[in-house]
């Protein structure tokens, strides 16, 4: 039951991060392909962010974004941008200039050239970048447990702390399977969005009913998870809540649970448990 709940958290956090990275990264890649002077600066910034250790970046974000979901998603989005921006820029730059010239010759506007020629031709390489980002995001999101955002990383960190190999595997194996599943899902989406003439596999480019059903279920789960989060945070009647947090020490986790039980049993206050956090800075964040 715990693994299922943490897996669902991990899926929602990962999908949210990847969708946000695509919404941000693809337009940036398109823009820098048209504004040549900006491409070195933008790619340089993206490369620099990629070089920063993930734990250090997450720790840096805590004073500004607090703990929980927001800094975790923000961090993964930043790390996911480089493959998307770079692949988008490279794919558009790689289009034959004679094709663009021919499009201009028949009277197409710049926007028409972008949406009818450049983006369709660039889609295979753009989707390759998105698939890389999606798989990377699954691994990076395990660090979300460090700041109390949940996910499969909770099992991994708990297992490391208690030298429990089975618990580590209980978090690591579902994460690996999830990464493969997300890559497979992205491959199906690629079949759908890439024009058949460009993909080069006209006969093999058909999406089966089962694949469509899996995509529909994934979309429904993602929409439900995001909708539930938005409803609980912004729409539902707010309850009296207090957060009880602890470091990743056994004694502190026991004390944290004792305090949480004491508060809930003697008051009408709901306790938000954030145990086994990464350190003092995280707790006071």
Predicted regions and their residues:
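C-terminal transmembrane helix and the adjacent membrane-cytosol boundary/short C-terminal tail
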Residues: 36, 93, 170-232, 236
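Transmembrane alpha-helices
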Residues: 78, 111-143, 166, 170, ...
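Cytoplasmic-entry segments and transmembrane alpha-helices of multi-pass inner-membrane transporters
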Residues: 28-61, 76, 84-90, 94
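Short helix-initiation/N-cap motifs at beta->coil->alpha
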Residues: 272-284
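Short, well-ordered beta-strand elements
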Residues: 238-250, 259, 269-275
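Glycine-rich helix-loop "coupling/hinge" segments at transmembrane-helix boundaries
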Residues: 63, 140-167, 174-175
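Periplasmic/extracellular loop-to-transmembrane helix junction in inner-membrane transport proteins
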Residues: 1-17
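Short cytoplasmic-facing helical segments at TM-TM junctions of multi-pass membrane proteins
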Residues: 87-127
